[in-house]
Amino acid sequence: MEKVLALLLVTLTVAYAVPDPRGIIINLDEGELCLNSAQCKSNCCQHDTILSLSRCALKARENSECSAFTLYGVYYKCPCERGLTCEGDKSLVGSITNTNFGICHDVGRSSD
């Protein structure tokens, strides 16, 4: 009986030691349900309406709608990809009501 328990203990230890590449709570892929942007690989947890489920989504591309900032960690429009800037409303009221939408622009390219 002791050998069986020891074998079971070793098996469980090895099973827990192997990292799972797919996230359950963090490191979530695009399309998976989320509660906050920090859970997503893309750092964007997005929903369409206040009653809809939030899912991880890709960040906004150039010339697409974006949100500059959110207080809640969930966006209606995702923030811009790296290197782009969200040109639009950056007010506190817009952040509270989650209506601070803009358009992603490449500032470096537009100044040339």
From Swiss-Prot:
Keywords: Digestion, Disulfide bond, Lipid degradation, Lipid metabolism, Secreted, Signal. GO terms for biological process: digestion; lipid catabolic process; response to bacterium; response to food; retinoid metabolic process. Residues 1-17 form the signal peptide. Its main location: secreted. It is found in: Secreted. Residues 18-22 form a propeptide. InterPro entries: CLPS_chr, Colipase, Colipase_C, Colipase_CS, Colipase_N. PROSITE patterns: COLIPASE_1, COLIPASE_2. The keyword Transit peptide does not apply. Expressed by the pancreas. Disulfide bonds join C34-C45, C40-C56, C44-C78, C66-C86, C80-C104. One of its GO terms (molecular function) is enzyme activator activity. SUPFAM superfamilies: Colipase-like. This is Colipase. The gene is CLPS.
